[in-house]
Regions:
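Catalytic histidine neighborhood in serine/cysteine hydrolases
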Residues: 33-38, 148-167
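Conserved alpha/beta-hydrolase fold motif
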Residues: 80-83, 106
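Catalytic histidine-centered segment of alpha/beta-hydrolase-like enzymes
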Residues: 49-50, 161-176
């Protein structure tokens, strides 16, 4: 039996039991990822939006917490490793995998531009991304799609969706969530 692990890394103010990471993890479980680790870190920096210094400090603090949380996992004992991440969690996940040389795949929910700063060349064929056109954390949807395309990462753009990939229409959100999870499942298989 092949051992498969999924690691979930949330964003600030978004925990692993919210829709994208919860259902992403459940989809992975249905495909054979029976073990999972939710990374639950605490934002000790406060409001970081629009402040590059605070954003960097938050990343460093959250990354340090992630190192501590994941330190006892022997990643070499798994046949397949999947990182499901959201927002700043996408930066932490890609950086962690890169620094620890973990052969894995990534599902990037609402990545930020910094997600691609140090690792985009290494994600081709090993990642998928989802972004919304009304995401206030992204200056330009085109910038995200461009970075993904240059890195060979399929990117799915959800019209009118915010940083949680939600719109003002609850029924549209449910349809979008189903579509996002189906695309996630296709990538994981």
């Amino acid at each position: 039996m092949k051992l498969k692990l999924v690691v979930c890394l949330p964003g600030i103010g978004y925990h692993c039991d919210k829709a994208l990471l919860y259902y992403g993890r459940r989809v992975a479980e249905s495909i054979g990822y029976k073990e999972y680790k939710n990374v639950e870190y605490v934002n000790r920096i406060g409001n970081v939006k629009g402040d590059p210094v605070k954003m960097q400090a938050a990343f460093e603090d959250l990354y340090g917490q992630t190192e501590e949380i994941l330190k006892d996992i022997d990643f070499s004992g798994y046949d397949s490793i999947l990182f499901l991440s959201k927002s700043v969690g996408t930066i932490i996940a890609t950086t962690y995998a890169e620094r620890h040389k973990i052969p894995c795949r990534h599902v990037l929910y609402t990545p930020l531009e910094a997600t691609f700063d140090n690792c985009s060349d290494n994600l081709s064929g090993r990642a998928i991304a989802f972004t919304g056109t009304a995401d206030p954390w992204v200056e330009s949807t085109a910038a995200i799609t461009d970075r993904c395309q240059k890195a060979g990462i399929p990117v799915h753009v959800i019209e009118e969706a915010n940083h949680s990939l939600e719109t003002a229409d609850v029924w549209k959100n449910l349809k979008n969530l189903e579509k996002i999870m189906m695309q996630t499942a296709e990538f994981i298989k």
